[in-house]
Amino acid sequence: MKKIILTTILFAVSALAFAQTERSIPREDIEWIDVWGPHNNDNDLPRVLLIGDSITRQYNAGVEQNLDGKAYVERLSTSKSLGDPALFGEIRTMLEQYDFDIIHFNNGLHGAGYTNEQYASALREIYGIVRSGAPHAKLIWATTTPVRVAPQMSELAPATQRSIDRNNIVREFMADKDVVINDLFESVGSHPEYYTDVDGVHLNQTGIAAAAKAVAGCISEVLDNGRTYSGLPVYWDTDKFYQAPGATPMPKLDKYGIKAALLDGVDFMGDKTQFFVYYGVPEGADADHPVPAMVLIHGGGGTAYWSWVKTWVDRGYAAIAMSNNGQFPVGIEDNPYEKEWGNWALVPGGIHLDCGDFGHALRPAEEQWAYCTIADIMLAHSFLRSLPGVDTERIGVTGNSWGGFLTLLSAAVDKRYKFAAPVYGCGFYDEFDLHAGQTGKAWERWLELWDPSHYIGNIDIPISWACGTNDFYFSFGPLQKSMALAKEKYSAVRSPMIHTDGADPAGQPAETFALADHFFKGGPDLPKVFAPTMLKNGKVAVEYCTAGRKVEKIEVIFSKGEGGRWEDRKWETHELPLPKKEGKVTFKVPEGASMFYVNVTTEGGIVASSPSIKTAS
């Protein structure tokens, strides 16, 4: 059995973090770190990481014995406490070494110099680091054990109140998260006979065995239940991003009543940042006459567009559009599609990362484009909600292309929206024609952290997709698979549909406007077309709901042949006779069709599409 100790490398990282931190950070008289990593070349069992202090170091061997043949157990034990930046570096380094299936965290006795508020803040940050560094690991959080008065041990020491306070903070924070609580405070701490009479903190041999059994039992139960992490791959501190950021007006860039500003953005690698926005509120909107609002997210190569904001303001909505590449449209004329398109100036103090640079995926999640952009979108949303006259209960989000990708992630993370409307944008990036042949650890890591297929199931609001059959960027097959993951959805699949990143209002599908008017202004719902039912003799029945809208036409869109790139596939359209009785259409599958779907178009050009179906042929 091969075993190695990573203490040297982690001690170096810890020492570096120690040297870079402020002297005001509370420190122990003796600082130490101890790492144990067995079975590094074995992958036949789940891998468990114990993170903690000297108590964890005490019971580590017993946990290994109890889980022998069931899991490999590794340990990061350290004197650093929550609140100490050095601990952040130690945990990140450990998570970079291995992929862990379960992480058991037990750290609360150290750091007496930190207030409860500081502990709570550090808890959020540590949780984010663990979630980002091990997105699919199952997380167990142990309550901190009490401290007893030595040598009699029957009396609890005053320091126990700190354990109680911190345990309450943990329980409150973890209440809505997919985290198992291992109550060591009760199962171990309630037994004075488990403590050594030297200091009233550490355990004797009986206590060590009991703690090891409790920890191993909790881990074993999680393994036996086949528990999987059902949350998001990456953690954002929404409490922080739900606060309205500071704003610096940029009146020289105001356009036709649409205002320009720099907003304070997410901290990036320890630095403060800013990002550019255009925003507007219709005239007459105030606290007595609030208006609904939209968050607008551009695609790759784009920036914040005043014209997009104005389109919505003219329809009676407040709106905000942010730059998600650290840029702003200095020097660009009113038409953003002139030859300078994509030639945007950089925002001083902005985050200048590329949405398509997958090589960054090996960095910590909070140093990657998707994390920073989602955080800034939340801040832009919070700023919009703070504006006088904006109805915070009536806000939707839409985005085109990469903005559609961001729309899906935003809707999963930010629970304040009422609907989401991605124009293109979907999951299963590894199945895109565009990324065929993409390999490597960075690519695999990007898929783990950011592929929308991990997020769509966590979206609790309706999703309205608008897309095309032959898009070069977002392939039709992955789009269909993504739609199937949604809890509640609308879809409009045109053949073909021009790809746009949102700068041109013509790129905003009619369905997005109609859905916003439905949810926020009492307009009719969108039509829906349900999955086709195969009948005998090659016939198909498709049911649909018009939502009170007049049907203009019903079409079957089909493709002949299979294989090859989705963008190269040929699609044909046959218009079907309108049925005498509305709500169901029956037709024969076109000869030679290998795949088809049905579109119902209602007045105003509102399209509703069925899921696609592969035929037996």
Stretches with model-predicted labels:
Residues 276, 288-299, 310:
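Short beta-strand element of the alpha/beta-hydrolase
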Residues 239-289:
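N-terminal cap/lid segment of alpha/beta-hydrolase-fold proteins
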Residues 507, 517-558, 572-584:
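Surface beta-strand/loop "capping" patches
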Residues 22-125, 135, 164:
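Conserved SGNH/GDSL esterase-like catalytic core that processes O-acyl groups on lipids
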Residues 145-223:
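Catalytic His-Asp segment of secreted/periplasmic serine-dependent ester chemistry enzymes
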Residues 459, 465-467:
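Short beta-strand/loop motif that positions the catalytic acidic residue
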Residues 310-374, 426-434:
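Cap/lid segment of the alpha/beta-hydrolase catalytic domain
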Residues 104-110, 129-165:
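Active-site segments of SGNH/GDSL-like serine hydrolases
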